[in-house]
Design a protein with these regions (language model features):
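Short, charged, low-complexity amphipathic alpha-helix
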Residues: 126-130, 136-155, 194-198
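A short beta-sheet element
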Residues: 43-45, 60-117, 121-137
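A short, aromatic/hydrophobic, helix- or strand-capping loop or linear motif
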Residues: 29-31, 123, 168-169
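Non-catalytic DNA-recognition/assembly elements of restriction-modification systems
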Residues: 1-26, 143, 147-192
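Active-site proximal loops enriched in glycine and acidic residues that flank catalytic Cys/His/Asp
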Residues: 75-76, 86, 99-102, 144, ...
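Sequence-specific dsDNA recognition surfaces
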Residues: 13-32, 37-68, 91-92
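Generic alpha-helical structural context detector
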Residues: 16, 20, 40, 96, ...
Length: 198
C-alpha cells in the first residue's frame, strides 16, 4: 500500500483531505519548566526517539495543543521526522500535529513515514535551515486507497501500534522504578542481603 505497486481504486489527493493539521506555536519562554508544572511541552525534534518522544519540558502557558495519538512532525530542519504523542501536549513552532479526520490514525502514521523522501526536499531547497510552510504541508500530494482497503489496513496495524505504546509505558514505569530503587540499594537504605532466592 505504501509503495508503487499498481494498487487499484487509489485516488490522488492532498494531506489535508485525510488529516487535521495544527502548526505549533511556542509559549512564553518563562513558562518552561522541568518540575512537571502545567502541560507537557515538545519544542521540536530534540525530544524525538524512534517512535515516542521523551518528556523533558512542561509549560504553564500552552498555546497550541496536540492530542494523545496525534502524529508529531518536525517542520524545521530536518523536516519530516515523526513521532507519536503519547499524552495530550503543547507543541512549539518546530512541530506540527497531524490527526486523521476519519479515525484511521495508523494508516496516517505509515503514510507519513512513506512521505519521508518527499519531505527531504524541504531540507535542501537553498535555505540555510530547512523548513516547510503551512500551505506546503497541507497540500502534500498523497495516494488515497479505497475506504475498504484503509479499514483492512487499520484492523491489522492499529492493534500493533497499541501494543507498541503499551510496551513503551511499561518500559517508562520500570525505568522510573529502577531510578528510585537503585540509589537506595547502593546506599544500603534498602537491604536485600536476607532475601532468599528460590
Amino acid at each position: 500500500m505504501f509503495i508503487d505497486n499498481g494498487l487499484k481504486n487509489v485516488k490522488k489527493g492532498m494531506l489535508q483531505d485525510i488529516a487535521e493539521i495544527t502548526m505549533g506555536l511556542s509559549p512564553d519562554g518563562s513558562s518552561y519548566n522541568e518540575k512537571q508544572l502545567g502541560i507537557i511541552f515538545f519544542q521540536g525534534r530534540d525530544e524525538f526517539s524512534d517512535r515516542l518522544p521523551k518528556i523533558r519540558l512542561y509549560t504553564s502557558q500552552p498555546k497550541r495543543m496536540a492530542m494523545r495519538n496525534d502524529i508529531l512532525m518536525s517542520v524545521r530542519a530536518p523536516v519530516g521526522d515523526i513521532n507519536i504523542a503519547h499524552h495530550d501536549c503543547c507543541i512549539g513552532r518546530g512541530l506540527a500535529s497531524i490527526r486523521s479526520k476519519y479515525n484511521h490514525q495508523s494508516f496516517l502514521f505509515y503514510t507519513m513515514l512513506n512521505l519521508k523522501k518527499y519531505l527531504d526536499r524541504f531540507n535542501s531547497e537553498g535555505t540555510v535551515f530547512g523548513a516547510i510552510s503551512k500551505d506546503a504541508l497541507y497540500t502534500i500530494p498523497i495516494d488515497i486507497p479505497s475506504e475498504g482497503k484503509i479499514k483492512n489496513f487499520e484492523q491489522i496495524a492499529s492493534p500493533i501500534d497499541t501494543c507498541i505504546l503499551n510496551n513503551y509505558k511499561e518500559i517508562c514505569c520500570l525505568e522510573s522504578l529502577r531510578d528510585t530503587l537503585l540509589p537506595k540499594l547502593m546506599s544500603g537504605e534498602i537491604d536485600v542481603s536476607k532475601i532468599e532466592l528460590e
